[in-house]
Regions:
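Alpha-helix-loop-beta-strand connector modules within alpha/beta enzyme cores
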Residues: 56-79, 137-144, 316-331
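Active-site mouth loops of central-metabolism enzymes
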Residues: 9-24, 83-91, 175-186, 272-284
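An alpha-helical appendage that flanks or caps ligand/catalytic pockets
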Residues: 7, 131-172, 204-299, 309-313, ...
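Internal, glycine-rich beta/alpha segment that forms the wall or movable "lid"
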Residues: 86-197, 211, 215-217, 229, ...
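Hydrophobic faces of well-ordered beta-strands that scaffold small-molecule active sites
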Residues: 3-7, 42-44, 77-80, 108-112, ...
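Glycine-rich, proline-tolerant flexible connector loops at the mouths of alpha/beta enzymes
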Residues: 41-65, 84, 205-210, 304-315
Length: 331
């Protein structure tokens, strides 16, 4: 099994209480911790406004961070979960990703999706097209990006994008461009796009849903004549880990108090949300949960530690006791 680590960027109120001028140092240090450790990749979210409610807390922009992490790290791969196609022209996005791929020595992962956060869309002047239109934009955008990365030029007279001889030089270091991660579990459109283009998928990691979405994806692959085994299936997990169950409860208490300071009305709800996840417990319990997920076909876990900006002990415990236990199944 392979592992990715989310670096807190503020979107989930995970830099609250840290002065904005000091937040980059926190993010950089965590990226470098991952770079020295067993993590294959680091990730940020492509969002502009905080969740679970919109606040004035800082949220750092994903692709700016990609460039900064490219310069600050040496080994770890760099991903976004996931870039919203509607937020940037796809030719421009392909150019940005290609440049960062060069800066990083070929370490970019291209997470891409149709987008969902209506408040952001409207606030930034993008409107909010219905889901079918957003997913059609995703499909056209992926076509443009693949052309640019393969050939250095692209044209598309699409319904949503009109690209006329866009040039992308230098090409990405990775032949054909960064691997595409198509995120989301929409069964008619998103998973069809994944079956067409994705090297990786990312959808709900809870057992019943993961199995069902995998079956839908496999069906699309069969219809398209694609080998389902070519696609690596990943999932995102909130991790709450501690040496003992009593200390896990303490960690959950910390989460509740953290949200009480920044969003009091959400404190109990957030504690419950984190407590209900599959990766909550001692290292042994989390290893068991991940082994069960692996049996379903989930071979790439991307892990979020809400306390990471303030306390790295959970990350370090996961590195010591969880990753090695699953190392024999890496691939």
């Amino acid at each position: 099994m392979r592992f990715g680590l989310f670096v807190p960027q503020g979107w989930r109120l995970d830099l609250a209480g840290i002065e904005p001028a000091g937040q980059w140092a926190v993010m950089r240090d965590l990226a470098q911790l991952a770079d020295r450790g067993p993590w294959e990749s680091i990730w940020v979210y492509d969002h502009f406004h905080t969740v679970p409610e919109v606040t004035d807390e800082a949220t750092h922009e994903a692709w700016t961070l990609m460039a900064a992490f490219a310069a600050a790290t040496e080994r770890v791969r760099l991903g976004q979960m996931c870039t919203c196609m509607g937020y940037r022209n796809p030719a421009y996005l392909a150019k940005v990703a290609a440049t960062i791929d060069v800066i990083s020595g070929g370490r970019v992962e291209m997470g891409i999706g149709g987008g969902w956060y209506e408040h952001e869309w409207r606030a930034y002047g993008y409107g909010f097209p219905r889901a079918g239109i957003r997913l059609a934009m995703l499909d056209e955008g992926v076509q443009v990006m693949r052309q640019l990365w393969a050939d250095g030029r692209a044209s598309l007279d699409g319904k949503h994008y009109q690209i006329d001889g866009a040039i992308c030089r230098p090409l990405p270091i990775q032949a054909g461009g960064p691997p595409l991660w198509v995120a989301g579990g929409g069964e008619r459109k998103t998973l069809l796009t994944a079956a067409q283009y994705a090297a990786y998928t990312n959808f709900d990691g809870t057992p019943d849903t993961f199995v069902h979405k995998s079956e839908v994806l496999a069906g699309h692959c069969t219809d398209l004549g694609r080998d389902f085994a070519e696609i690596t299936r990943s999932a995102n997990y909130n991790v709450v880990i501690a040496p003992t169950e009593a200390e896990v409860a303490d960690r959950l208490d910390w989460i509740q108090e953290h949200y009480r300071t920044v969003l009091p009305g959400q404190a109990e709800r957030q504690r419950q949300a984190f407590a209900s996840g599959p990766l909550v417990g001692t290292p042994e319990q989390i290893v068991d949960a991940l082994r069960s997920a692996e049996q379903m076909g989930m071979t790439y876990a991307i892990c979020y530690f809400v306390e990471a900006a303030y306390d790295t002990s959970g990350i370090e415990l996961f590195e010591r006791e969880v990753v090695p236990a699953l190392a024999e199944s890496a691939g």
